[in-house]
From Swiss-Prot:
Encoding gene (name): rplC
Role, per record: One of the primary rRNA binding proteins, it binds directly near the 3'-end of the 23S rRNA, where it nucleates assembly of the 50S subunit.
Residues carrying N5-methylglutamine: 151
Transmembrane segments: none
Biological processes, Gene Ontology terms: translation
Listed name of the protein: Large ribosomal subunit protein uL3
GO MF annotations, alphabetized: rRNA binding; structural constituent of ribosome
Lineage of origin: Bacteria, Pseudomonadati, Pseudomonadota, Alphaproteobacteria, Rickettsiales
Pfam family, one: Ribosomal_L3
Record-stated family: Belongs to the universal ribosomal protein uL3 family.
Summary of subunit composition and partner proteins: Part of the 50S ribosomal subunit. Forms a cluster with proteins L14 and L19.
Length: 216
């Protein structure tokens, strides 16, 4: 099991293949992705790499983290993430991970945060059909209806689908195929859509349900 990388969503585009079919692509940029530390089975109970991305001002880093970066002899990073790995996939601290960490035709799993939609009603948030448009319904056409029973149990159960904050959820999309890798511009072109807004950070890992490397 290899480490993943922290990337940044650039946007979307599309291309046409030889059959004239349109393929939607999401562009992901991998820049300044560096190994910050190791987690070992003997010391921490599991094997992992700590990956950091984007240099940070030293004045914005806490004292404990300053020592971590000083020990690694690298510049402070804005975002850190651990990736579980197998024992034979450790990479030296301060090593830089580039886009060639992945290959064309490979399948990946991507974890990202969905775009926030703010406070949303039940029809938008949960796809409820709403109440009747006429015939006895007043004001509450887009209402979610009843939320519970009577004195027993006398409460609304947790997890009840109601109006509330929508979006900003951590989501993993599995088995997305890498269409192309541009080493000059540090871009990975991935077929399909990926959650999150432009410039948001996401995690790219080898697909857990597919072969590690599949050449197109």
């Amino acid at each position: 099991m290899r480490t993943g990388i922290i990337a940044q969503k650039v946007g979307m585009t599309s291309v046409f293949n030889d059959k004239g079919e349109r393929i939607s692509l999401t562009l992901v940029k991998v820049d300044d992705c560096q190994v910050v530390g190791h987690k070992t089975l003997a010391k921490h109970g599991y094997n992992a790499l700590v990956i950091g991305v984007k240099d940070q001002k030293i004045s914005k880093v806490t004292k404990p983290m300053k020592q971590v970066f000083a020990n690694a002899k690298i510049a402070p990073k804005t975002k850190l993430k651990e990736f579980r790995i197998s024992e034979d996939n450790f990479i030296d601290i301060a090593s830089i991970l580039e886009v060639d960490h992945f290959r064309v035709g490979q399948f990946v799993d991507i974890t990202a945060t969905t775009i926030g939609k703010g406070f949303a009603g039940s029809m938008k948030r949960h796809n409820f059909r709403g109440l009747e448009a006429s015939h006895g319904v007043s004001i509450s056409h887009r209402s979610h209806g009843s939320t519970g029973q009577r004195q027993d149990p006398g409460k609304v159960f947790k997890g009840k689908k109601m109006a509330g904050h929508m979006g900003c959820n951590k989501v993993t999309i599995q088995n997305l195929k890498i269409f192309a890798v541009d080493t000059n511009r540090k871009l990975i072109m991935i077929q399909g859509s990926i959650p999150g807004h432009k410039n948001s950070y996401l995690l790219v890992k080898d697909a857990i349900k597919k072969a590690a490397i599949t050449i197109a």
